[in-house]
């Protein structure tokens, strides 16, 4: 494995990361939003802020996002699985947390650009402040930096990080192809469609959590099953909040962005398999017309689809109660009517 000693080029990581997006977004309740001028999207509006506000802003898009979420976002999980790591190996402790932050936040930065999102945790998205070009470049710079640090300090962790990035981007690539080509590229029915969606989610989201276990265990797979299941729960939870949580929509400034973008989610797959809602969903995903999307949102919020999603979410959480509590995503979802 002599390649571990070589530096990873910025260009290669940029190519890997260009399609990545990990965040979970929502649109406004009317499924519409004002269009930002192209110049604002490209260059941001930080320069237009007052000097006082500009001086208070974080120095780069990554630090801005960290200021919203908090640094060392995975610390509670690290302490749960290895409570003595900070004391026994402080260098590894810091490296693991920096790797997890870098992957999580860098992919969110790119995701918000690709989804043209305006808000995250009730704050403007980074690319609206710093511009899309600087935001994407900073994401790649952060990833490249943490990869090179890992390869220098703990080569085994660097190898795990590179493999995880490949799997995450493979999952995201599947999702983006389905979004680009529509249902002609997702020709699955019934249980097969759910399995295909879960496979994508396992790569895109499950890998992020599996990576944490691999880093803590120096490449060991002892936590793979547990953290893969938790990754599925996290994906499912965010898919459901995207449709069913008013609180989540407020924090994101929008509702049902997956639907509007033509991106598949678990509720959408369930609705596609329901005879009473399948045609409505197919029409909305094909046309993207406002009236069709509004009708599809009503179908997603219908009792059969909502109940099926809530059952799946409850089943996915079994045995993961402590991890769910530590992860701390607590936005409420509307009860069935």
From Swiss-Prot:
Taxonomy, superkingdom: Eukaryota
Binding-site residues for Mg(2+) 2, renumbered to this chain: 111, 115
EC number, as in UniProt: 2.5.1.-
Residues bound to Mg(2+) 1: 111, 115
Keyword Manganese among UniProt keywords: no
EC category name: transferase
Cofactor: Mg(2+)
Disulfide bond positions: none
InterPro entries, alphabetized: Isoprenoid_synthase_dom_sf (IPR008949), Polyprenyl_synt (IPR000092)
Keywords linked to the UniProt accession: Magnesium, Metal-binding, Transferase
Pfam families (alphabetical): polyprenyl_synt (PF00348)
Cofactor note: Binds 3 Mg(2+) ions per subunit.
Pathway: Secondary metabolite biosynthesis
Molecular function as annotated in GO: metal ion binding; prenyltransferase activity
GO BP annotations, alphabetical order: alcohol biosynthetic process; isoprenoid biosynthetic process; mycotoxin biosynthetic process
Annotated knockout phenotype: The disruption of the whole terpendoles biosynthesis cluster abolishes the terpendoles production.
Cleavable signal peptide: none
Known function: Prenyltransferase; part of the gene cluster that mediates the biosynthesis of terpendoles, indole-diterpene (IDT) mycotoxins including terpendole I, terpendole K, terpendole C, as well as the kinesin Eg5 inhibitor terpendole E. Terpendoles biosynthesis begins with the synthesis of geranylgeranyl diphosphate (GGPP) by a yet unidentified GGPP synthase.
Family the UniProt entry places it in: Belongs to the FPP/GGPP synthase family.
PANTHER family reported in the protein's UniProt record: GERANYLGERANYL PYROPHOSPHATE SYNTHASE
Protein name per its UniProtKB record: Prenyltransferase terC
Gene that this sequence comes from: terC
């Amino acid at each position: 494995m002599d390649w571990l000693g070589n530096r990873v080029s910025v260009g290669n990581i940029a190519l890997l990361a260009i399609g990545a997006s990990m965040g979970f977004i929502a649109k406004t309740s009317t499924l519409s939003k004002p269009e930002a001028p192209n110049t604002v999207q490209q260059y941001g509006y930080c320069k237009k802020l007052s000097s006082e506000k500009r001086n208070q802003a974080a120095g780069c898009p990554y630090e801005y996002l960290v200021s919203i979420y908090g640094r060392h976002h995975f610390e509670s999980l690290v302490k749960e699985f290895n409570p003595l790591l900070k004391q026994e190996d402080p260098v590894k402790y810091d490296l693991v947390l920096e790797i997890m932050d870098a992957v999580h936040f860098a992919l969110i930065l790119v995701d918000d650009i690709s989804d043209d999102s305006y808000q995250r945790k009730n704050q403007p998205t980074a690319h609206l402040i710093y511009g899309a070009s600087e935001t994407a470049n900073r994401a790649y710079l952060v990833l490249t930096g943490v990869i090179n640090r890992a390869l220098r300090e703990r080569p085994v962790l660097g190898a795990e990080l590179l493999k995880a990035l490949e799997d995450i981007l493979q999952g995201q690539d599947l999702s983006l192809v389905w979004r680009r080509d529509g249902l002609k590229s997702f020709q699955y029915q019934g249980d097969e469609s759910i399995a295909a969606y879960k496979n994508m989610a396992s790569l895109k989201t499950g890998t992020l959590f599996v990576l944490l276990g691999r880093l803590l265990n120096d490449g060991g797979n002892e936590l793979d099953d547990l953290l893969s299941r938790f990754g599925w729960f996290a994906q499912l939870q965010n898919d459901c909040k995207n449709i069913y949580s008013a609180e989540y929509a407020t924090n994101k400034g929008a509702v049902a962005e997956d639907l509007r973008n033509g991106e598949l989610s678990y509720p959408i797959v369930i609705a596609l398999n329901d005879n009473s809602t399948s045609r409505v969903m197919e029409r909305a995903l094909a046309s993207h017309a406002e009236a069709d999307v509004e009708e599809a949102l009503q179908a997603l919020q219908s009792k059969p689809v909502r109940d099926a999603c809530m059952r799946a979410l409850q089943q996915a959480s079994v045995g993961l109660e402590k991890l769910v509590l530590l992860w701390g995503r607590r936005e409420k979802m509307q009860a069935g009517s």
